[in-house]
Amino acid sequence: MAPAKFYFSETSIYQELLKFIPADAKVILELGCGNGTIASEYKQINPHCRYIGMESNPQLAKNAAAQLDEILVGNIQQNISTLNISPRTVDCLIYSWNLMDISNPTEILKYCQSLLKNDAQVLVIIANLQYWHKIINLLKGNWENSEIIRHWLSLESLKSDFATAGLQIYEVQTRGEKGEEFEKFLKLTEPLVDALGLDRKKFTTQTAAEYFIVRATRSPIPPRRLLIQTIIMDPKVCGTVRVLEPDKFSATIPGVRTISTVKTADLNLGWPQEEKVFIWQRTILSYPSDLHKLKSLLEKNYLIVAEIDDHPLRRPEYAENNYLSYRGCHCVQTSTESLAKFLRQYNPNVIVFQNQLAKIPLLSEHNFPNDSYPSIFFGAVNRELDWKEIMPIINQILSDHQDKIRVKVIHDELFFKSLNTANKEFYPFCAYNQYLEILASCDIGLLPLNDIQINQMKSDLKFIECAASGVAVLASPTVYKNQIIDGETGLIYYSVSDFAKKFRKLIINKNLRERIVNQAYNWVKNNRLLCQYYRQRRDWYLHMIDELPRLNEELKNRVPELFS
């Protein structure tokens, strides 16, 4: 049986569903898993999940088998009871678009409800029979094949079916193509809408949606509503890792909305009964001219959070403004404990959210090329003092290998120009995805950091990015000695001569590189994926919101001008 016809592409619909799957699910059941597209993507986010699929199309099921842990081929209505799943073990139930293919969806929902944990989520995509394209096609006599869909569902009937099955819908989102043609449709149907006594606004909403994304839960307790709103002041540096990816994961938690904007913010986006967090990412607040911004947030009942992942001493403006960026907030989130210790002298309410990776791609054969000459990666900002003393060694080793070793450099043009080889590539500062692609094309990563205060407070993000990308690292002890097991998950150098020795070793010993890559990859997979930690943020924000009376008193003592 063919799935319901959509005007949107299958890929875009799968991507929409992927946004809402809880990133830390231990067991997922997808009914109508197709060729395993969602499972394949999700397994990079959470490789430890047990992903079970059911598919009636044998060919699609065959293609999906490699992506899923288990798959059952057969008619959902007839065969669902044969699934090897214990009651109350499923964290997320997904219906792609096949719920309407089932003659009695309520029966299936009831059965699946028995498999769900108390806090499990249900995700469903439902085609909208009132979509304006469908109405036009019907009027033209081009109604879609009725055999494709056995059970048309409206939003109201869907809510009834879910309630009967003991499931509570807590959110419905719409997707659909609008544009000029939709506006023409509304204009043409306006007399009919008025003649039938229909509400124009409701009609517009109902006909604009090609399909609904329905989110439900087994729990009868409504989720606590939270808006996480971030103003990104430095999108190029760590905006993805520190804001965008955590936001995506937080948005999978029932009741959580996330909004991020660059350098501007609308403070009127909160919904009724929604608690609010406002996060300043890498923001230098001016004293006293920016006090009014903080006052506005206090008046709107926001929890005010500063987000910083680099040492403030790099920017004298922080001190020049009496560290208002941290003193003027309720609390601070940062990336390392050493940085947190520094920040606590300006605000005692500091928490560490380590940098984690949102996904980990599969290691493949391209990670271990057969040719004998590896590629070297170097990519960093403000590192000249860190690499200066090892540059002669790098050039000597490149020369010893007759310039057959390729070096790829991101952003650091001086490092690139200092390389005495023609076998090199330079890339300017680039988008995060492109950065990861370049990184994954290399074999050895160089991570030098001198032992100075600013460097001591940096995170180990570069190492975990290399490890997840199949790149063996040669790193300084500063920052990395506490994370890298020397000789197992990477190599640590303690002097220039030690760097030379270990760099040569990594270049000529392919077996050593492979062993390091595999062990580092597995360490990151087991310890440093965002799916293992993302709920900490939401839990901490809610805890801080509960503590707002205390936090406001402390804030008043630090910056009394905010309350005058």
Across the structure, where does each feature detected by a protein language model lie?
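Conserved N-terminal segment of class I S-adenosyl-L-methionine
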Residues: M1-R88, F185-L186, A209-F212, M233-E245, ...
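Extended catalytic core of nucleotide-activated donor transferases of GT-like folds
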Residues: S96, I259-F342
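S-adenosyl-L-methionine-dependent methyltransferase catalytic module, highlighting the catalytic core
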Residues: S103-Y111, Q121-P220
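N-terminal pre-catalytic "stem/leader" segment of glycosyltransferase-like enzymes
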Residues: S219-L285
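Conserved catalytic-core segment of nucleotide-activated headgroup transferases in glycan assembly
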Residues: I232-G255, K359-I360, P369-A440
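Nucleotide-sugar-dependent
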Residues: R314-R315, L385, N433, E437-I438, ...
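A charged, aromatic-enriched C-terminal amphipathic alpha-helix characteristic of glycosyltransferases
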Residues: I360, I508-R550
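Conserved acidic donor-binding segment of nucleotide-sugar-dependent glycosyltransferases
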Residues: D486-S497, K505-N511
